[in-house]
Amino acid sequence: MTTRVAQTRTSAAPPAEGRPRRGLVLGGGGMLGAAWTVGALCAVEEAVGWRPGGAEVVLGTSAGAILAAMLAGGVRTDQLRDHQRGLPITAGPLAGVAFDYETAVGGALPPRPRAGIGSPGLLRDAVRHPREYPLLTMVSAMAPHGRGSLEPVGELVRGLLGPGGWPDGSPLRVAAVDYRGGHRVVFGDPGAPSAAVAEAVMASCAIPGWFAPVRVNGSAYVDGGCWSATNADLMLGRGLDEVYVLAPMALRLHPRGRAEPARGTVAALREWRARDRPRGVLAQLVGRYRRAVTRQLLRETRLLRASGVRVHLLAPTLADLAVMGPNMMDPARRGAVLESALRTSRAALDGVR
């Protein structure tokens, strides 16, 4: 498969002398993936003594793009946590900002989509050149246009970063997929289409079949997860020493990228199936998807490590998966997922500093 990205890379800005140049990757995962990621971010800050929002590059995909924008807008990890908990925020960019996590994106199920194929042109190209596209990109081309609205997400981002273009010097990068050409775009990079941050984040969150594609400068874009749930390989060539990857759709990785001790990815999935016995079509599909995401993530991180970048991975444990359930858009589980992630991520990061 050929990796295609519609822009050139840029080196990270120099950090303070003596400090490693760090990058942060926040993967997609819907409502519950965002809640898990907030818990993991808090654990990273506590364990490493490093403020994730201070990374030289913060790359977000889908729900991770929302959190990346919030961090780039100056929101602290403890404020993200308290906001998820429904506690009042009295200082900083989130002070007084209302966001209804229960209803913002329409609830646990999508509205009935429109009839028809979402991107006939992309589907035609993918059939002609299947090696050039991930399977999920090909599938997304067939999905009909969704009727869900991402405007509440856009309003949240505009409230934090304003309605204009990309802030000068911002570390924020947002991954999305061009819905006609099928290639990845990293908004915020030199050579990428110009976009307001809110537009870019909404584009990165536009799950085919759930939300309508988001138009930026006349072109339609969909969820960056249609290429990769993390897009961690996009951190190559940015002059970074180490990268933290938080991947809520992967399978229970430890900080250095292993599956849980002495177990490979396949063995971990078998144990998960034996213990939790996922039933129903959705549960089985999510299990298969997690396995595929984990394998792709490990391929991406091998590329980073081969280039000399230290990579630290975090993903849900068995305990997290049991709390999440199969529907990553179920708002009723959000609070429990956050608290579980705080516990399990702290344990996974014990002794990392």
Cite the ranges covered by each PLM segment.
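Patatin-like phospholipase
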Residues: 1-61, 69-353
